[in-house]
Amino acid sequence: MILEIITPEKEAFKGEVTSVKFPGTSGGFEILNNHAPIISTLTKGNIRIITTDNKTETLAINGGVIEMQDNKIIVLSD
């Protein structure tokens, strides 16, 4: 699936991933391939990304919104 993380300053990440963990406002959650469509708010914390070549990346955010549809995740964050 494709993950795109956009901040006011730049595109922080864009690429193929196998899983992503988010700091949701109601608690952390993980999105895997073929996840049901979802829109959720995010709180301050870390986004943990597992890429298709099994590398882990972590990005700190202050909050934001995530949308997942058709195996594409878009995150708008601070």
Predicted regions, residues:
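Compact, glycine-rich, soluble single-domain proteins
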Residues: 2-78
